[in-house]
From Swiss-Prot:
Ubiquitinated. GO terms for molecular function: DNA binding; ubiquitin binding. This is RNA polymerase II degradation factor 1. Its main location: cytoplasm. It comes from the Eukaryota. Recruits the ubiquitination machinery to RNA polymerase II for polyubiquitination, removal and degradation, when the transcription-coupled repair (TCR) factor RAD26 fails to efficiently displace stalled RNA polymerase II. Also involved in telomere length regulation. Binds DNA. GO terms for cellular component: chromosome, telomeric region; cytoplasm; nucleus. Residues 16-58 form the CUE domain. Residues 118-139, 191-204, 294-307, 373-383, 634-645 have a biased composition (Polar residues). It comes from Kluyveromyces lactis (strain ATCC 8585 / CBS 2359 / DSM 70799 / NBRC 1267 / NRRL Y-1140 / WM37). The gene is DEF1. Homodimer; may form higher order oligomers. Interacts with the large RNA polymerase II subunit RPO21; the interaction is direct and serves to bridge RPO21 to the Elongin complex in a manner dependent on transcription stress. Interacts with RAD26. It is found in: Cytoplasm; Nucleus; Chromosome, Telomere. GO terms for biological process: DNA repair. Residues 83-95, 162-173, 264-279, 309-327, 336-362, 395-421, 454-490, 509-521, 567-626 have a biased composition (Low complexity).
Amino acid sequence: MSQFKRNASSKKLDSETKYKLETLSELFPDWTNDDLIDLVREYDDLETIVDKITTGAVTKWDEVKKPSKKEKPASHIEHQSHSSHQQLQQQAASHLDPEDSPSLINQHHSHQRQSRSTSKFSNNSANGKSVQQRQQHQSNNKDNKKQPSKDSLKPAPLPSKSNAGNNAGSWAAVLAEKKKAHEKKIDHTKSSNTIAHESTNEQSESNEHTEPTEVEVAPAQPVDSAPESVSHQHAPESESIATTNGDSKPKSWADIASAKSRQRQLQQQNKKQQQQQKSKPLDNFDALKEEVDQLSSEQTENGNHAISQEPEQQQQPYAQQSTFEEPAQQEEEVVAETTEQQQSQQPQQEEPAQPEVSQVQETAPVSLPEETNAANGVSNIQFGSEDKAAQQTLASQNYYQQQPNQQYAPQQVPQSAAAAAAAQAQAQQYYMYQNQFGYSYPGMFDNQSYLGYGQQFGAPQVPQGQVQPGQQAQPGQQPAAGSPNAQQGQTASAYGAPSGTGYQSQEVPQQSPAQQHVQPQQYSGYGMPYMYYQQSFPYGQPQYGMAGQYPYQMPKAGYNYYPPQPQSQQQGGQAQGSTQSQVEEEQANGQQGGANANAANASQQYQQYYQYQQAQTQPQQQAQQGMPYGYSSYDYSSQTSRGFY
């Protein structure tokens, strides 16, 4: 075999491999070329190799203690059997290597010898190299002697082997080992005692190197999971080693995980069959499927039980709702169950024990919506038919207010609370909507001098949620047009739908942005709406003292909101064209507008500057006159309103 490997290696050194080898030998000068060739064959990716060498997951071939004669063939064959697993996996990829075929023949012997080679590993474990490293390394090299082709070294996506490798901590991996061990145990009880003792030592040692895996699994798995977590390639074979150790003496298993014994027995049988039928990996799929179904259905039953109990207790108050909710709930559980089964069958053989976990996880999120629905009485998270249920529940709760459209109105809160909430919401919206087009903003009419004020808001306003003294209507009800209170109905629907339309007034959200607020001067008494403050942004921040933030913002005639600031730096761009003398000329020319007069108390420089600007902008102002274009401000000379809309 090894000779074969050498030839192959000399034949097959293509440029890529050479490049990798050079890089690696630069990085790790103490590694020999042969070892590196093995690694390059094993792992395609350069990064992976470097990673493995630095973490010590792979060690140099020559460091492993030379196996004695008896063990040498054993380890060869062990790796052959490994390759046979891989070969089976390869059927998926259909890249079969002719060299591998002997492994099928040798497969029967593999287990026998494996147990011996394992004892060798555990004896060696005293020399300070971790068992895993040695074992990993041996496996690397043996594999490569055996299997030069890159393809055959990649784990293929076939049943239990490769997947067990990928979930380093999965029960499936442990069970797979269990199964193999079981066979070996039957074959050779003779070697079992010595190995059992060694295996316990070895386990304790390799525990130090394991990545954290599931708690119950840990003792059996260590040997297997560390190499796996470092390399998926070796999963199967390291598994088999772990197996021999952990398993040749069943008692230790029983001690470690007696709780799972029933499952494990089932598992053993299945896996044993699977082992025998290796060449036809999917034969015993049905048996497995049954088992999975059984597990998952047990689980769903429990899950459903838990789910359906709680809503039922809480749902008694809402009879209707519960009847509607039940179908949805069952539907969901069915979905959960089926998806669960599909999931557990996909990784076909691997995960027979996984259903427990995944099932719990799956039912949990399903149950949440139900519980919240039941608790709130109104479903926040609605599936399919449940919103019907919610609507009807509302209808039944509001049965005492038999208005035709009542069913659509949001649930009524006690009136005082509703009024407060509405007031708050509208206060918020008042500020929100100030600067949006297409509304008439109540802020505009706050100072009663505004012409349209009396017409728009002449009618006394009653906050939405409250009822006028004479009116015995439910909060959501529109008074009939003829009634003495019709006036309120009409003003209320000034922004909402007109009262004839069969909409509940409440369905139009807070109709006017701030209907309740229109009592004069309610807002901390600025007599002027934001609309007339100058805006430097198109969005709706109220512009109080923003001059500092926006370089081109200038005070206008009659506004002292902005402290005068020396504008020369801010306005640098426009100033560049003019010299000081020009500015003074202009001043002498008597061009002081009203704006200048107002700015007179500011510094001399400021005045000159401002005036220069006026001179710049006059032509533009004339062009703009009469265009409703700097919408947010009536002062068309303002720098800021130009160009935004």
